[in-house]
UniProtKB/Swiss-Prot annotation:
Lineage summary: Eukaryota, Metazoa, Ecdysozoa, Arthropoda, Hexapoda
Classification via SUPFAM superfamilies: Ribosomal protein S2
Domain of life: Eukaryota
Compositional bias per record (Low complexity), positions renumbered to this chain: 264-278
Subunit structure, interactors included: Component of the small ribosomal subunit. Mature ribosomes consist of a small (40S) and a large (60S) subunit. The 40S subunit contains about 33 different proteins and 1 molecule of RNA (18S). The 60S subunit contains about 49 different proteins and 3 molecules of RNA (28S, 5.8S and 5S). Interacts with ribosomal protein S21.
GO biological process annotation, one example: translation
Signal sequence interval, chain numbering: none
Record's protein name: Small ribosomal subunit protein uS2
Length: 301
């Protein structure tokens, strides 16, 4: 597909990116029309895609997109969340019209509804999830470009780009490569220097993880702002130790005599009278006849 030109051949840097994003990893199942893009099958049953065929079909898709006179007539669609960010980035760099999220049925066939559109070319992320726009495009004769896995159906698909469309990194990388080749064919960017847009911008990010990272960044920034510039500035020593000593005259009297004199004097508490001591220990003092007391008390009952 490169036409014998070395400048259009697959570079080692692009192959490294594809291998890192697992673009060559297919699924265990394989459609009979996708067998021509399968390189081999591993022992665990997973099919391996031929990256050379992937690059050739990517260049063909880029040429088809460049052939459209108005870039806004190219519709890029992704119903799956992992491809929505890549679709929006691709549209922002190439001028295409993005449809990220749910596709409104009848947007290509029902002329009554307000969402009716007439695109000239359709690029979808997954033929499985984006089957509705592919079917409607077949009704109105719109060519379709699709990123297809080994198990993806090729019904109504005109240009199939074999790749791993289940991995967020693989989907982001393929949209990034397609956008770069489109801009190169248009002459917007040169081929020799690398594209200054990093591929990370096309990767899907989980909203919860992104929120956690943002919250962690805010907390770290707040901690840095609250921390003093110099750790020892807050505890700088005084010039003289005598400046920090409080005079003893303000805290205590001059002598012990004055201190004792300053203590208030209280009168001693009166002592209780001592009980009389009896000479005879056998007879307690003040003892009465207990038997007489009991008899008197019982008689009163």
């Amino acid at each position: 597909m490169s036409g014998g030109l070395d400048i259009l051949s697959l570079k080692e840097d692009d192959v490294t990116k594809m291998l890192g994003a697992q673009t060559h990893i297919g699924s265990e199942n394989s459609d009979y029309q996708m067998e021509q893009y399968v390189y081999k099958r591993r022992n665990d049953g997973v099919h391996i895609l031929n990256l050379r065929r992937t690059w050739e079909k990517l260049l063909l898709a880029a040429r088809a997109i460049v052939a459209i006179e108005h870039p806004a007539d190219v519709f890029v669609i992704s119903s799956r969340p992992i491809g929505q960010r890549a679709v929006l980035k691709f549209a922002s760099y190439t001028g295409a019209t993005p449809i990220a999220g749910r596709f409104t049925p009848g947007a290509f066939t029902n002329q009554i509804q307000a969402a009716f559109r007439e695109p000239r070319l359709l690029v979808v992320t997954d033929p499985h999830t984006d089957h509705q726009p592919i079917t409607e495009a077949a009704y109105v004769n719109i060519p379709v470009i699709a990123f297809c896995n080994t198990e993806s159906p090729l019904r109504f698909v005109d240009i199939a780009i074999p790749c791993n469309n289940k991995s967020p990194h693989s989907i982001g990388l393929m949209w990034w490569l397609l956008a770069r080749e489109v801009l190169r064919f248009r002459g917007t960017i040169p081929r020799e220097p690398k594209w200054d847009v990093v591929v990370d911008l096309f990767f899907y990010r989980d909203p919860e993880e992104a929120e956690k990272e943002e919250q962690a960044g805010k907390e770290s920034a707040a901690a840095i702002a609250d921390k003093p510039a110099d750790e020892f500035a807050a505890h700088a020593p005084t010039e003289s130790w005598n400046d920090t000593v409080v005079p003893s005259a303000d805290l205590a009297p001059q002598s012990w005599a004055e201190e004792s004199a300053s203590i208030p004097q209280y009168a001693p508490a009166p002592q209780a009278a001592a009980a009389p001591v009896a000479d005879d220990w056998t007879t307690p003092v003040g003892a009465d006849d207990w038997g007489q007391d009991w008899s008197n008390s019982t008689s009163q009952w």
